[in-house]
Amino acid sequence: MWYTLDENNKPVKATSIMEATDWMENNLERKAVKQENIGDIFISTVFLGLDHALNSDVPVLWETMIFGGEHDQYQERYTSYEDALEGHKKALNL
């Protein structure tokens, strides 16, 4: 299932993949929740748009990843914008 975000960063089911794609293309600043470089390490938290939940009623729509350094390829996914922000902070402190 594909999603967009409302003005409060709450997920809204998209009516089609085209609606979700259009939203993503026109909301790049909201798709990238937080992105930071620390030396050669890049930490990125983004809205995925596609539900990554397995056997869950709650969609998993955000993801934090670390690229580079000792935690390269670290990944966490979240069910809310607020959890994604907290997860990004956690990744910064690894």
Question: Where are each of the predicted segments found?
Answer:
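Short, ordered coil/turn segments that flank beta-strands lining enzyme active or ligand-binding pockets
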Residues: 7, 69, 82
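Short amphipathic beta-strand/extended segments with alternating polar/hydrophobic composition
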Residues: 13-17, 44-46, 74-80
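Replace the tail clause
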Residues: 2, 72-75, 85
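Negatively charged, low-complexity tracts enriched in Asp/Glu with abundant Ser/Thr
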Residues: 1-41
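Short aromatic-glycine-(Arg/Gly/Cys) micro-motifs in beta-strand/loop hairpins
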Residues: 45-74, 90-91
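A short, charged, amphipathic alpha-helix used as a generic interaction element across diverse proteins
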Residues: 78-94
